[in-house]
A protein has these predicted regions:
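Catalytic His-Asp segment of secreted/periplasmic serine-dependent ester chemistry enzymes
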Residues: 148-234
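N-terminal secretory targeting modules
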Residues: 1-36, 65-67, 225-231
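Alpha-helical membrane-targeting segments
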Residues: 1-15, 122, 150-165
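Alpha/beta-hydrolase-fold catalytic nucleophile elbow
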Residues: 105, 143-144
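A short helix->loop->beta-strand "cap" motif at the edges of active sites that frequently abuts
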Residues: 135-139
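Generic structural signal for well-ordered alpha-helices
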Residues: 124-129, 170
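Conserved SGNH/GDSL esterase-like catalytic core that processes O-acyl groups on lipids
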Residues: 32-36, 42-122
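Short, amphipathic alpha-helical "lid/cap" segments that border enzyme active or binding sites
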Residues: 83, 87, 121, 125, ...
Length: 234
């Protein structure tokens, strides 16, 4: 499996992060919603040119439409980061003092490293604790785990092993967040079959065989916005 992993890393293009890591959207008359997104390569917008067409910009737009109020948003993300690295390197960079919603996308890199569930749970607890020191009441929403079993660039073996591991980490994340007040995990497992309604072939869901395309970012972000709306926390 290690040899297959090296071949995949060599074959997948090294794409840059998206540009424009902050923005303002919406024309509603309500109080401005302050949003930050935190995470790994998907939140960093790997696979699209700008964050406006990626996850964070689409999420902000969907929330603005859903709530009828403007949204100001900022991205704190880095490709390749595990939950532990996010806590150590990104959380100290957060400049905002007042935030209404925090959305976090993690799990892919911890799965690729085959980090054991106990280590993942500890990293997630540390991450939440670091955020709670700064934002004690702000809703924290963890997005779905990445659909690794659907990645076209991965071999069947890696899809099976790493894909099963990310699902295990998802169950661990659910276990950690369930008793925590105002902390939520969108546990729905992403499958391409769920998104076939947009009438696109499977390859169109990925920019490089691993990272999402603009289409996937936008479908995913709207789905997460719907989940946030159903939570009723805003």
């Amino acid at each position: 499996m290690a040899i297959q992993g090296k071949r995949i890393r060599a074959s997948v293009p090294k794409l840059p992060p998206a540009k424009g890591a902050s923005g303002y959207i919406g024309t509603g008359k309500g109080q401005v919603l302050r949003l930050i997104t935190i995470g790994e390569s998907t939140i960093a917008g790997i696979g699209v040119e700008t964050h406006e067409e990626g996850f964070s910009g689409t999420l902000a737009r969907a929330l603005a439409d859903q709530l009828g109020k403007p949204v100001v948003w900022k991205v704190y993300a880095r490709s390749g980061y595990t939950a532990k690295r996010v806590t150590e390197k990104l959380i100290p960079q957060i400049a905002e003092t007042d935030i209404d919603l925090i959305v976090i996308g993690l799990g892919g890199n911890d799965a690729f490293h085959l980090n054991p569930p106990w280590r993942w749970r500890r990293s997630i607890r540390d991450l939440i604790a670091a955020l709670r020191e700064r934002f004690p009441e702000t809703p924290i929403v963890f997005t779905n785990m990445p659909p690794i079993k659907s990645f076209p660039a991965f071999t069947p073996l890696i899809k099976r092993v790493v894909g099963s591991h990310v699902e295990l980490l998802g169950r661990s994340l659910d276990h950690v967040t369930e008793p925590m007040p105002n902390v939520f995990y969108y546990a729905r497992v992403i499958t391409l079959e769920d998104w076939r309604g947009v009438s696109a072939p499977p390859a169109d869901y990925f920019s490089d065989g691993v990272h999402p395309s603009a289409l996937t970012y936008q479908v995913w972000a709207r789905d997460v916005a719907g989940y946030v709306g159903r939570l009723g926390v805003l």
